[in-house]
């Protein structure tokens, strides 16, 4: 039986560092980090993620501002909120919950986030820095994936890694981060032929497709490391893309949902807000 990768445990050390940073600033009567998180509509995964952000931020002493907009808002409505946050010196990080409702122009809206406050690496400029290897905020979910793999003391160099999903939020950036670790990376998507065959060759399988319990044991190589990035609402519960019960006996390591990638992602987001505050003051 495989072992569970506990994202909460991996996050603990980082949380202690954040706590110390915030407490020192409070003791010296200095500004503390503040995150503004924007949610448009009622996507189940986004609501869950925002709630997690707020809970962790509060526990670490970081200010958290929720901005919840109706699903029928316009592009300009969302952009106006972003502009207000760009101009607010008390806000160090802006988090836009994705996906947005389909009638909104996601690229147009993301473009308006200040790169200095883009703590989840959503803007074109931030992503350009990622792909060119320049200093900038790392995208939190992809960074969480790589951090969890590294926590296993596994040498990623030369490993066959399959990333299932090609979104700009997870698939593409996590592939880039793994390339930076010298992995041999294959990206699969809805048009990939022989999907089971490709996935079953992976030493490390990263799944981010938004299909609850889609991946079963037939997609898994014996003793593979499986990282489940999915968070979907399924039968009233938050569920991953991997059928946990069917895969745990075949994988060597597997992240649970919840308690895996998401548990660390939120902590890394808050860490980025602390870094943004340092950059602002330098």
UniProtKB/Swiss-Prot annotation:
One of its GO terms (biological process) is L-histidine biosynthetic process. It catalyses: (6R)-5,10-methylene-5,6,7,8-tetrahydrofolate + NADP(+) = (6R)-5,10-methenyltetrahydrofolate + NADPH; (6R)-5,10-methenyltetrahydrofolate + H2O = (6R)-10-formyltetrahydrofolate + H(+). The keyword NADP applies. Pathway: One-carbon metabolism; tetrahydrofolate interconversion. This is Bifunctional protein FolD. It comes from the Bacteria. GO terms for molecular function: methenyltetrahydrofolate cyclohydrolase activity; methylenetetrahydrofolate dehydrogenase (NADP+) activity. Catalyzes the oxidation of 5,10-methylenetetrahydrofolate to 5,10-methenyltetrahydrofolate and then the hydrolysis of 5,10-methenyltetrahydrofolate to 10-formyltetrahydrofolate. One of its GO terms (cellular component) is cytosol. Its EC number is 1.5.1.5, 3.5.4.9. Belongs to the tetrahydrofolate dehydrogenase/cyclohydrolase family. Homodimer. NADP(+) binds at residues 165-167, 190, 231. NCBIfam families: PRK14172.1. The gene is folD. Keywords: Amino-acid biosynthesis, Histidine biosynthesis, Hydrolase, Methionine biosynthesis, Multifunctional enzyme, NADP, One-carbon metabolism, Oxidoreductase, Purine biosynthesis.
């Amino acid at each position: 039986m495989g072992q569970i990768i506990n994202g909460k445990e991996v996050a603990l050390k980082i949380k202690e560092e954040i706590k110390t940073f915030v407490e020192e600033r409070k003791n010296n009567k200095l500004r503390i980090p503040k995150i503004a998180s924007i949610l448009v509509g009622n996507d189940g995964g986004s609501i869950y993620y925002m709630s997690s952000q707020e809970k962790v931020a509060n526990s670490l002493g970081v200010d958290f501002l929720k901005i919840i907009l109706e699903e029928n808002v316009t592009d300009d409505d969302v952009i106006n909120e972003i502009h207000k946050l760009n101009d607010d010196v008390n806000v160090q990080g802006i988090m836009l919950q994705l996906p947005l409702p389909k009638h909104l122009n996601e690229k147009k809206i993301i473009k308006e986030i200040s790169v200095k406050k883009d703590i989840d690496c959503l803007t074109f400029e931030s992503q350009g820095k990622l792909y060119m290897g320049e200093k900038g905020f790392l995208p939190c979910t992809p960074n969480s994936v790589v951090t969890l793999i590294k926590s296993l003391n596994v040498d990623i160099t030369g490993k066959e890694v399959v990333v299932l999903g090609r979104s700009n939020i997870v698939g593409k950036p996590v592939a880039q981060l793994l390339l930076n670790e010298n992995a041999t990376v294959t990206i699969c998507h809805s048009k990939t032929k022989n999907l089971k065959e490709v996935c079953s060759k992976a030493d490390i399988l990263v799944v981010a497709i938004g299909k609850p319990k889609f991946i079963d044991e037939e997609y898994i190589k014996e003793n593979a490391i499986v990282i489940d990035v999915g968070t979907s609402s399924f039968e009233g519960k938050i569920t991953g893309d991997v059928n946990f019960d069917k895969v745990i006996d075949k994988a060597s390591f597997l992240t649970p949902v919840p308690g895996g990638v998401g548990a660390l992602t939120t902590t890394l987001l808050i860490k980025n807000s602390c870094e943004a505050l340092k950059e602002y003051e330098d």
